[in-house]
Design a protein with these regions (language model features):
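Mobile cap/lid helix-loop segments that gate and shape the active-site cleft of serine hydrolases
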Residues: 271-314
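Alpha/beta-hydrolase active-site loop
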Residues: 201-223
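Short alpha-helix in the alpha/beta-hydrolase fold that links the catalytic acid
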Residues: 320, 334-344
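Short beta-strand/loop motif that positions the catalytic acidic residue
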Residues: 318-319, 324-326, 330
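N-terminal cap/lid segment of alpha/beta-hydrolase-fold proteins
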Residues: 53-55, 59-62, 104-148
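Catalytic histidine neighborhood in serine/cysteine hydrolases
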Residues: 342-363
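Catalytic active-site module of serine/aspartate enzymes centered on a nucleophile-bearing elbow/loop
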Residues: 367-391
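Primarily recognizes the serine-hydrolase "nucleophile elbow" in alpha/beta-hydrolase
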Residues: 90, 217-272
Length: 391
């Protein structure tokens, strides 16, 4: 993996490479990161304020350029600038601690910038709200061009532990799907993104509940082929999505974009400092996601709870096509988790394990070191599988 900070923290290097592989430009990244090289050596937690300041300054510069371009009537240029500004600020916000007073204001600004990007860069993407247990789940819906001619299949794309629907948007996976005639619902499910930050909706083990709400909403749309609704989850979504597909039988296929078969076991390893962590301020973030704020001094009790975030006895109940895509050198989730999910998915009519090697790239966590490569592989598999299901 390209590591901008040779002696810096994994979390920062992962953030840089993820941003570059989601449409970021290397010159802009260099101008943001060069001033904080010394801060990187101070450690991921201590250096986070400097990271935010540097990346926010880059965002401010792009926003000013976008506004100037828009005033001049150069809407394509403005749209590209809004898109990259959204990408950069999303990554900076991801690094912040839950307790950081900058977190919510930064996220709200990110929402505003993303909306500008939709208007000028991605007009087929729109903000939607999914009814869910007396409230709503925020999401972005990409209507594939194929919907101009009738209903199209759709993928529900779900987050992991620390990503947001804005990261999904920046990844351009929805665009790869759209080019193959497939729409995409980028969902901030409970425990992620806007649902967590602004609505206080925390993660739940029974992911089929919110997945069912998404399917209910999609089935009511005239532009959706209700017989071909699939689910794709990256990172911790490699637990969320298979669990949903096992029990929400209206889902027609499932992809674990990074297997997360036994998340509880991974947490116990992290307590012993085995493996890399995805974000600074890790335990504060994890406890927030699961609604266990304030339990920092009761981590053993949380680890007992986390043991239930496990797909043993679950993937056996998946009865639809199931793809597991995993990097051979994933430093967060060991490859053995992918093999466990594959070996136990005995009732899937089409199960496939795709391991990405160092020789080809996309070998790090969810393929962030070569995100377009794994993204297009998954999009091709989804398109092929939906075509098979239509026959």
């Amino acid at each position: 993996m390209f590591e901008y900070f040779p002696t810096g923290p994994y979390t920062w290097n992962l953030g840089v490479v993820a941003t570059l592989n989601s449409g970021g430009l290397i010159d802009e990244m260099d101008r943001a990161c060069r001033p904080i090289k010394d801060a990187a050596n101070a450690g991921e937690d201590a250096g986070t304020p400097e990271f935010l300041r540097a990346w926010r300054a880059l965002t401010d510069q792009l926003v000013a350029q976008a506004e100037d371009a828009e005033k001049a009537g150069h809407t394509r240029t403005a749209g590209q600038l809004w898109f990259r500004a959204s990408n950069y600020l999303a990554q900076a916000e991801r690094m912040l601690a839950h307790s950081d007073p900058n977190r919510v204001p930064t996220y709200r600004r990110m929402l505003e910038i993303a909306q500008k990007a939709f208007e000028l860069h991605s007009p087929r993407v729109s903000r939607v709200e999914i009814p869910y247990e007396g409230t709503t789940l925020p999401a972005y819906f990409s209507a594939a061009p194929a919907t101009d001619d009738g209903p199209a299949p759709v993928i529900v794309l779900v987050n992991g532990l620390d990503s947001t629907k804005e990261h999904m948007y920046a990844s351009n996976h929805w665009e790869e799907l759209a080019a193959r005639g497939i729409s995409c619902l980028m969902l901030d499910q409970p425990g992620t993104g806007e649902a967590l930050r602004l609505q206080g909706l925390t993660a739940r083990i029974d992911t089929e509940v919110w997945a069912g709400a998404a399917v209910d909403w999609l089935e009511q749309r005239d532009d959706v082929d209700a017989a071909r609704i699939g689910i794709v989850g990256w990172s911790l979504g490699g637990y969320y999505a298979p669990r949903a597909a096992a029990f929400e039988k209206r889902l027609a296929l499932c992809v674990a974009w990074g297997a997360n078969h036994d998340w509880g076991a991974v947490q116990r390893r992290r307590k012993e400092r085995e493996g890399e962590r995805p974000v600074p301020h890790y335990w504060e973030h994890v406890l927030w996601v699961w609604g266990k704020d304030g339990d920092e001094h009761h981590l053993d009790a949380f680890l007992d709870f986390a043991d239930a975030v496990n797909l043993d006895g679950v993937v056996e109940q998946i009865t639809v096509p199931f793809l597991i895509a995993h990097g051979a050198n994933d430093r967060q989730i060991p490859l053995e988790m992918a093999h466990r999910s594959y070996d136990q998915a005995v009732n899937s009519p089409k199960r496939e394990l795709r391991v990405f090697t160092p020789q080809e790239g996309a070998t790090e966590h969810i393929g962030l070191d070569h995100l377009p490569y794994v993204s297009t592989f998954i999009a091709d598999w989804v398109a092929d599988t939906f075509a098979e299901l239509k026959r």
